[in-house]
Amino acid sequence: MIDTEEDVYKRQVRALSPHLTMEQLKQAWYGGRDGSFDHYNWTRYYALNLHSVFYRGTLEWRCFESTLHAGVARANITLALAISAQAINQTRTLAKKTPVTENPAFTFRTFLLRLGLVGEEYKNVRMHLLKDLPGDPAWRYDRSQYVCLQNRRTEQQEAR
């Protein structure tokens, strides 16, 4: 399999030292030349637009659909802030893909909990972010496979 120019570029960026200055990161991001003054630079078309950091000094997330629903907008903003906060506060990272289980809703819910979106105040955020994913966010596998639930059902049926 032949690597594309983009694949080579991604590998080079991931291999960079974690102790880079912003200027070194800028040089690496633009492949050795300063593209921060180009408004429509090709590096801006990713979910996380770092071109915006060098061009305007802001961070831009380009992975959300437009919406007028206040709850969905709040959920998207909260998710972006939580991921940004984790990136700032995290001391170590591991570039490893998490395998998607047969239940994407459960996998994403555990990710949200790891980000700190726990508790009643984030219940609505989790609901909006999980509503379109297939599967049960509370259970990794089908509920009927859990012995504890089967025992509970049996006890309830015997009590009747």
Identify the function of each model-found stretch.
Residues M1-R160:
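C-terminal accessory/tail domains of diverse enzymes
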